[in-house]
Amino acid sequence: MAFQIPRGTQDVLPGDSEKWQYVEHIARSLCSRYGYQEIRTPIFEHTELFLRGVGDTTDIVQKEMYTFEDKGGRALTLRPEGTAPVVRAFVEHKLYGSPNQPLKLYYSGPMFRYERPEAGRFRQFVQFGVEALGSSDPAIDAEVMALAMHIYEALGLKRIRLVINSLGDLDSRRAHREALVRHFSNRIHELCPDCQTRLHTNPLRILDCKKDRDHELMATAPSILDYLNDESRAYFEKVKQYLTALGIPFVIDARLVRGLDYYNHTTFEIMSEAEGFGAAATLCGGGRYNGLVQEIGGPETPGIGFALSIERLLAALDAEGVELPVESGLDCYVVAVGERAKDEAVRLVYALRRSGLRVDQDYLGRKLKAQLKAADRLGASFVAIIGDEELERQEAAVKHMASGEQTNVPLGELAHFLHERIGKEE
């Protein structure tokens, strides 16, 4: 029986994995530059965490979670998103007592959602995200959005736009909720079955519906921006002011509500405008969640963050034709001709690697010509050939693969020679 990977998953093979490493390196480096530290949480949590943290009326909780019972009868769930686990760790380890407030964290790892697989979307996907906990300053909202944009721009994406909205505080959302119920109630039969249920549980979710997004009722639905109280309106104005001061262009979409229940005040998405990327062009989403820490059992603590899918980021790079400057190939391939030379090659390869070079050798007992072909396939910049004659002179015949230029180099000087030549090439 030939086994295949489960639907909605993928293997990342050599040649592609280097792109993943590069993208993750850029994201991590920028987070460090902005003062964010890494946090790592388990890939499964108690199911109740997501019921409370994500919201039991959300599509994620109702339709998409991978939930199971362990041998101890505990209900556990493979994490569908990263914010609730980070907040759980924040509360459990009493990080709210840290003098370094706000606490700025980033994470990266696999998430799991049972949804229909499509281009750039998987049932297991890698999410990179940040969370800033402990500040309700609108300047940190702008910082989080600036960091997200910086990651995409540093990777070479140009056809992206930042879309923002405000959901306001609790009073603003309550007034907007009542207006939505009045708006949709008389024509509820025109909505999809899910939205008919949402009208009574969480009417704001109707605005996030993919099935009814083009319905005339959506276009005429009450705007949350018309229901912001003075405090919420002033907060949103300050966020926009900071973004403008940073020179970050944005557009406002009053229907941007995001798919999780914990958001309030600022919400945002980064969209791809690349041709052929598809209708679902959201690359990144985030927002403020001032009540989530309390909901999970901690003290009242404001927070804001974002999450992006590495898979969708790579798809956007492909759509824009961006070539990542990933390292590939070897610095040197050591070719051994004869058993005595093989013994020396093993020692030499180890020494060259210890000096910081990318080096490999033959392990299949191939002839000289076959080893040279292998070096070429592996993208080696140089080949160091050792045979009986070279051993007698304690030298290697070093060939530059691109030019064909060949020179004899003492074995004790080979590492220095390669570092010098490769440094000049770079």
UniProtKB/Swiss-Prot annotation:
It catalyses: tRNA(His) + L-histidine + ATP = L-histidyl-tRNA(His) + AMP + diphosphate + H(+). GO terms for molecular function: ATP binding; catalytic activity, acting on a protein; histidine-tRNA ligase activity; transferase activity. It comes from Geobacillus kaustophilus (strain HTA426). Keywords: Aminoacyl-tRNA synthetase, ATP-binding, Cytoplasm, Ligase, Nucleotide-binding, Protein biosynthesis. The gene is hisS. Pfam families: HGTP_anticodon, tRNA-synt_His. This is Histidine--tRNA ligase. InterPro entries: aa-tRNA-synth_II (IPR006195), aa-tRNA-synth_II/BPL/LPL (IPR045864), Anticodon-bd (IPR004154), Anticodon-bd_dom_sf (IPR036621), His-tRNA-ligase (IPR015807), HisRS-like_core (IPR041715), HisRS/HisZ (IPR004516), HisRS_anticodon (IPR033656). The keyword Plastid does not apply. The keyword ATP-binding applies. Homodimer. It is found in: Cytoplasm. GO terms for cellular component: cytoplasm. Belongs to the class-II aminoacyl-tRNA synthetase family. GO terms for biological process: histidyl-tRNA aminoacylation. Signal peptide: none annotated. Its EC number is 6.1.1.21.
